[in-house]
């Protein structure tokens, strides 16, 4: 796509719109672009009557800030996406977007070069980046992030009721001083989980104050923990994710605070660290396979029916009870 744009001295966005049959391109220029694309052997896009499995390439875009050393939640999610794509004969192409690319508003290469028919955008990205991708003309689905102002299909885990369920369990175990661990506003997922925490606490007649919320990450999205802002030690910490819960366990152990004897800790996601840690972390299990499956189904639906109504799918999970929570007498 970038080669076509260079030859005709137009933007890749213009080329993408012309090839996708979208508005904003004159008929004369559209014909030139389509003719040159045919001459250069550009692969045609999927149409309503086409068989998707014949030549469907799907891009998966992840922000570099979410990719940690070794395994992470998003790596597991990506593996399941590849599985579900392979089951229908489609190919998944991964692109990790660097912080510099986000800041400079650089369109991902797989979009610039026209290598994909559609994109699964994993996690939170700046609004301007999302708008830029939308203007490229390539259909995409947002996975693990949602905002009503976004006019794209989306698939998210049930962070709100998931955290509500976790805190309800802590309350049933006799806990009242429960601190939420997560930087509210850092991501849509953390914010949803915070609201679920607030609802459970409010229903129990407990007012949530600022000192009951413990931030867990810095501006680079690295997990950083400190108890300095807590006026009174809680009996339980409800963490926004398992990685934070695991690091909190380590943080507490280093300071001689026992889990669950002195304080209880819960996580969210049911990532592998929640099982391997000592003690095992009580958490909310996100149905990663269902999220991957739904995101693929959503995107294929959009490719086959471009004018279909927007869909926002919430995938439920379940509470996973382990050894990091103790009843308060």
Outline where the language-model segments fall:
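Hinge/beta->alpha junction and helix N-cap segments in small-molecule ligand-binding domains
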Residues: 63-76, 94-102, 155-165, 181-225, ...
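Short, well-structured alpha-helical segments in soluble
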Residues: 102-116, 220-233
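Short acidic capping loops at alpha-helix termini that bridge into adjacent secondary structure
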Residues: 176-177, 208-212, 259-264
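Flexible loop/turn connectors
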Residues: 224-329
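Flexible loop/hinge segments that line or gate small-molecule binding clefts
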Residues: 122-162, 243, 269-281
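N-terminal helix-turn-helix DNA-binding module of bacterial transcription factors
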Residues: 1-52
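N-terminal helix-turn-helix/winged-helix DNA-binding helices
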Residues: 37-73
